Amino acid sequence: MVNDPPVPALLWAQEVGQVLAGRARRLLLQFGVLFCTILLLLWVSVFLYGSFYYSYMPTVSHLSPVHFYYRTDCDSSTTSLCSFPVANVSLTKGGRDRVLMYGQPYRVTLELELPESPVNQDLGMFLVTISCYTRGGRIISTSSRSVMLHYRSDLLQMLDTLVFSSLLLFGFAEQKQLLEVELYADYRENSYVPTTGAIIEIHSKRIQLYGAYLRIHAHFTGLRYLLYNFPMTCAFIGVASNFTFLSVIVLFSYMQWVWGGIWPRHRFSLQVNIRKRDNSRKEVQRRISAHQPGPEGQEESTPQSDVTEDGESPEDPSGTEGQLSEEEKPDQQPLSGEEELEPEASDGSGSWEDAALLTEANLPAPAPASASAPVLETLGSSEPAGGALRQRPTCSSS
């Protein structure tokens, strides 16, 4: 007896272990579901902010090389060109996506890379013209600017050559000037007439240049200015706002689905149950009226159903007469083609509401099995069986 193991203590420890293991599994499952939900909401928030940023922010800067061409069918003995250098620049990406966005102001500049040659120094001022066109080649905007090389004296050129001689010898520096010509300071795209390209022309036949680039830079204001100059701060605020909004929606949906604490359904379900009960009563009344045809010359009666709240049909009177109360039990009327022997209900002086309802105390004695068959046959036919009239039992008023 002394060496017997403590069985109740072991059982208690086993039960406690099972309970703790169940709680641990439940907590682990809840934590996993919560973590997956938070991760999904965070991913959706980042996706929404990225989609908004991509659709709302235009191209910040667009740099396109400018390739000039000119005629060569003139006399080659002269040093000047046969025509002005002209270039056609497309303002679409891949032939489909446009570079410019509607309503956004842009700064359009032309960068010219000119050598400091004696020809360019003697060139003086020259004119640069840009013509923007839309579909079909129709010109919609034109702008012209004058340009010239920056002046430097012979002494300054000599000193510059001496200082940067080592870099010039190894090719790390060149004797050239980069001119930036502002063609449009505030160019706005028209949504009805989009810009598809531009034609650039230099009005000089003696110009010498290394290359040229057309730069289009967006000038942001308002929200776009904040998104461009403070990208990390705006991204954090945008993702946090989306995450908060989605979390509130998910929380309200969870509360409504689990507890139903926001919009309770008790009143709505009660109304639905009452409507269903009324519909079932009407259906039973319709079926009873279908079993009682009214021939010509006979007095039509209004059958009423003995349906209770549980939906029992009048075909089983033994189960309904004891359950119906005086307020819910309908008045019993005689069948069509039968004569009533009760003067109080047929002479018009009284009403069916004045007659007392049947109760368990004054129910008539049940008829034998042999006598119930003619009654059933009478309910299914318009003529009484055997030519006998069924008398309605007189109910004593309480």
From Swiss-Prot:
Entry's Gene Ontology cellular component terms: endoplasmic reticulum membrane; lipid droplet
A Pfam family recorded for this sequence? Seipin
The UniProt-reported impact of residue 70 to A is: Loss of oligomerization and function in lipid droplet formation
What InterPro entries does this protein map onto? Seipin (IPR009617)
* Primary localisation category: endoplasmic reticulum
Q: Mutating residue 156 to D: what's the consequence?
A: Loss of oligomerization and function in lipid droplet formation
Which residue ranges does the record annotate as region Disordered? 281-398
Q: Which residues lie on this side of the membrane: Lumenal?
A: 48-242
> Per UniProt, what is the membrane topology?
Multi-pass membrane protein
Q: Which GO terms describe its molecular function?
A: phospholipid binding
Name the reported effect of residue 169 to D.
Answer: Loss of oligomerization and function in lipid droplet formation
GO BP annotation list: fat cell differentiation; lipid catabolic process; lipid droplet formation; lipid droplet organization; lipid storage; negative regulation of lipid catabolic process; positive regulation of cold-induced thermogenesis
Where in the sequence is Phosphoserine found?
289, 346, 351, 372
Key words, A-Z: Congenital generalized lipodystrophy, Diabetes mellitus, Disease variant, Endoplasmic reticulum, Glycoprotein, Hereditary spastic paraplegia, Lipid degradation, Lipid droplet, Lipid metabolism, Membrane, Neurodegeneration, Neuropathy, Phosphoprotein, Transmembrane, Transmembrane helix
Q: Which residues are glycosylated?
A: 88, 242
**Where in or outside the cell is it found?**
Endoplasmic reticulum membrane; Lipid droplet
Q: Which disease is it linked to?
A: Lipodystrophy, congenital generalized, 2: A form of congenital generalized lipodystrophy, a metabolic disorder characterized by a near complete absence of adipose tissue, extreme insulin resistance, hypertriglyceridemia, hepatic steatosis and early onset of diabetes. Inheritance is autosomal recessive.
Report the function annotation for this chain.
Plays a crucial role in the formation of lipid droplets (LDs) which are storage organelles at the center of lipid and energy homeostasis. In association with LDAF1, defines the sites of LD formation in the ER. Also required for growth and maturation of small nascent LDs into larger mature LDs. Mediates the formation and/or stabilization of endoplasmic reticulum-lipid droplets (ER-LD) contacts, facilitating protein and lipid delivery from the ER into growing LDs.
Q: Could you identify this protein by its name?
A: Seipin
Q: Which organism is it from?
A: Homo sapiens
Source gene? Answer: BSCL2
